[in-house]
Amino acid sequence: ESRLKSHPITKERSVSLELKEIKNEGIFYLPVDHQDCTQKSDVEAKIIKDYCSKILGKNYTEDKQKKKIAIDDIMMVAPFNMQVNNLKKILNKKEARIGTIDKFQGQESKVVFISMTSSDPENLPRHKEFFFSRNRLNVAISRAQCVAVILFNPKLLLADCQKINEIRLVNNFCKLLKYKI
């Protein structure tokens, strides 16, 4: 059908992250192993902090102008306020763009890190329909103008699905496995 098309300006937008594991455009899944995390994951927050340190000051091009990636060119999102506050504490940068998935609806950033936070299905603080929501996943990933990195524990994919809709929701996360770093 090919009805959905990118705006021509997107071809002129690029980042040069100079990272082996994360290319300069696309979606990337970073598996993170942790235990007993429900609404907060220090492991995921520290990984995001490390990647932010690596990409700050790298080049990006927009409107045919080269610029340096600043902290406000990076967005960090999580499904839970507790992880948002944890990211703010660990990053310790006031100008950092950190919030829940819902907060940034309609906004964009060069690079987006998505911290899914919970360790496994037993540690989900809310129902599967909230956590695995296709719409919320789409909103989170589509905030990225160039690069989206989603961090989650692969144990989340072992969710015990009781309904067809739950299978579909978890399956959307299974599809992210092909973008594994």
Segments (PLM) and residue ranges:
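Charged, gly/pro-enriched flexible loop segments at helix/strand junctions
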Residues: E1-I9, L156-D160
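Amphipathic coiled-coil/heptad-repeat helices and related helical stalk/stem segments
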Residues: E44, R97, S133-R136
